[in-house]
Amino acid sequence: MFKKLNKMKIGARLKKSFRQIILIFGILSALVVVIMLYTINNYGTILDNYAYPQGDIAMAMNESAEVRAASRGIVGYDSDSLIESMKEQHEQAVKSFEEYLEKIRPTMITKEGTACMDAIDKAWAEYKEVDAKVIEVGATTDTAKSLQAQRMMTDEAAPKYQALDDALQKLMALNISLGNAERAQLRTIMIAAITIIIIVIAVSTIYSNSLSVAISKSIEKPLNELKDRFITFA
């Protein structure tokens, strides 16, 4: 290639050399931009689908506990005003829990995540059904009915709540696992991309240096020959 370059006139030689160098660094710049865009896009995906939902899952778990606590208060208190207050808390906790579920649902983009959400929906529906029966029986100052409702909470509601909590815990574990896997994959790709960039820079530097040496020699040689002729004629 350098031999072909040496046969060109100096102007054409320099233009071709500069075009080659500009092309190389243009490709390198494009590669860097593509990597940056890929990183930004995938980092955003990790945040939206794994990091942020972990906080929402934790809040959903907290709200489910609030639902159970409010139910216990409803069947445990012997004051009408306190029972009504706990009913309001119960309704708010149910609403908040379901809002968090709907917030989490769109971020479950994997088959495993969808399966976990289906399990949570099933467990929540079953728990709500038993919970409603408990409140229907125990939302009273009647001691006998309150005791009956408390037994229902232990015998019927507790296993349903445990199933709901297990499903939420499984979703959290899955989300953390998938998020870690995505981060590891992104890290691997970034290391590979940086390695490629370093190699391209090194090759470009070596090529540019070789090109400059070849051009300088091709210019220097005829000048030296011309100088020798002048010395001979002198």
Regions found by a protein language model. Give the residues of each.
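Selective recognition of signaling/oligomerization transmembrane alpha-helices
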Residues: 20, 177-229, 234
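N-terminal membrane-insertion alpha helix
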Residues: 25-50, 76, 176, 185-192, ...
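Internal alpha-helical transmembrane segments of multi-pass membrane proteins, especially GPCRs
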Residues: 12-19, 48, 52, 56, ...
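Juxtamembrane amphipathic/hinge helix adjacent to a transmembrane helix
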Residues: 166-182
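Membrane-proximal N-terminal soluble sensing/regulatory segments of transmembrane proteins
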Residues: 42-129, 133-160, 180-181
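Extreme N-terminal signal-anchor transmembrane helix of membrane signaling/transducer proteins, especially
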Residues: 11-39, 199-207, 211
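Positive-inside N-terminal membrane-insertion signal
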Residues: 1-23, 149, 192, 220
